[in-house]
């Protein structure tokens, strides 16, 4: 039964993606239900150049567009108190930040203290070095995440891992991503599913969302066009309504819009937040 449900989910996902890539609108029954994302977030890597030039002004413009939650990927030489004040001044919060695995290994307590002062609830490892991607490496990474999760738990913070496409490479019959999911403790480690990168790997997210309920507290809401390029949300082929509809099963709590290299960052996030606001599921 589980295999049949996963095959069915994959078939629906591919059918709807094909419709979207062909420029067709989805039938109302497929496209919309009656829920919407309540609090829309932004992964600030999208605006890294703007933040480096005008940190406070950039946050103000982001807030004016209607974003409410910020996920950091660097703090631009500011203290936790300065970050917290800038967020408060603009009516923003920051549930999460990307922290490199090297910092998790070497200076985790500092990262915990920094995150706690800002009010963050997740420390997210954004990637794994290319030199550390063997089967045994992934098992060690899972152990590292578990140990870190034990330490962060005491501060009310949870560890998480963010995917690219390389984690879906397989060793035998098992994807490396499966190793991370299956060898980390659900009470200690969550996952942030990047919708562009899982699509870029040619992998249907539905079996993961169905098969690992409650593990995916965060999403990177990103789009991919028919040529495989990253694009602003709403300009590509990913069926967000179908993915968002798995919120209760998957455990989605935070929806962070992102574009790695948007060109015009503010134009991109304006288009993207408009799209996400209008996704019904």
Can you annotate each of these PLM segments?
Residues 28-53, 60-61:
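C-terminal segment of N-terminal export signals and the immediately downstream linker at the start
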Residues 34-35, 59-64, 78-94, 107-120, ...:
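Acidic (Asp/Glu)-rich catalytic clusters
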Residues 69, 76, 101-190:
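Active-site acidic/histidine proton-transfer and metal-coordination neighborhood
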Residues 42, 62, 70, 87, ...:
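Conserved, mostly hydrophobic/aromatic
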Residues 70, 154-237, 244:
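Acidic/histidine-rich catalytic cores of soluble enzymes
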Residues 48-52, 71-82, 100-108, 130-136, ...:
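Acidic-and-aromatic substrate-binding clefts and catalytic sites of carbohydrate-active enzymes
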Residues 2-24:
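N-terminal secretory signal peptides and thylakoid transit peptides that target proteins
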Residues 42-46, 72-74, 96-101, 125-128, ...:
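A cross-domain feature marking catalytic cores of carbohydrate-active enzymes
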């Amino acid at each position: 039964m589980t295999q049949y449900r996963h095959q069915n989910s994959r078939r629906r996902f591919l059918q709807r993606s094909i419709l979207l890539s062909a420029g067709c609108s989805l039938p109302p029954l497929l496209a919309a239900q009656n829920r919407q994302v309540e609090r829309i977030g932004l992964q600030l890597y999208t605006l890294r150049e703007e933040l480096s030039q005008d940190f406070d002004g950039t946050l103000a413009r982001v807030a004016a567009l209607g974003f409410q939650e910020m996920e950091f990927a660097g703090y631009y030489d500011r203290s936790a108190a300065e970050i917290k004040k800038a967020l408060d001044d603009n009516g923003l919060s920051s549930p999460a930040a990307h922290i490199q695995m090297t910092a998790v290994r070497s200076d985790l307590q500092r990262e915990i203290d920094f995150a706690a002062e800002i009010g963050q609830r997740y420390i997210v490892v954004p990637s794994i070095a290319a030199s550390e991607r063997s089967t045994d490496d992934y098992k060690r990474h899972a152990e590292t995440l578990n140990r870190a999760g034990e330490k962060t738990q005491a501060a009310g913070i949870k560890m998480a891992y963010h995917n690219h496409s390389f984690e879906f490479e397989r060793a035998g019959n098992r994807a490396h991503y499966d190793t991370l999911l299956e060898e980390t403790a659900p009470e200690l480690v969550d996952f942030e599913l990047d919708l562009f990168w899982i699509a870029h790997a040619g992998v249907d997210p539905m079996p993961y969302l169905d098969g690992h309920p409650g593990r995916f507290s965060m999403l990177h809401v990103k789009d991919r066009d028919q040529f495989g390029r990253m694009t602003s949300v709403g300009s590509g082929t990913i069926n967000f309504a179908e993915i968002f509809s798995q919120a209760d099963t998957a455990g989605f709590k935070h929806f962070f819009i992102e574009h790695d290299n948007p060109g015009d960052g503010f134009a991109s996030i304006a288009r993207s937040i408009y799209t996400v606001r209008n996704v019904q599921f």
